[in-house]
Amino acid sequence: KKYSCLEGETHKLKPSPEPNMQECTLYSGSSCCYA
């Protein structure tokens, strides 16, 4: 199963790491949002 993100201006096409994320650090290794 491929993982994808919700459609929207603030979401990426697919999850990727966001090491600078301040909140939801559980998802910092695979995030749909930009940190």
Swiss-Prot record:
Disulfide bonds join 5-32. The keyword tRNA processing does not apply. Keywords: Disulfide bond, Transport. It comes from the Eukaryota. The keyword S-adenosyl-L-methionine does not apply. Belongs to the folate receptor family. Required for the transport of riboflavin to the developing oocyte. This is Riboflavin-binding protein.
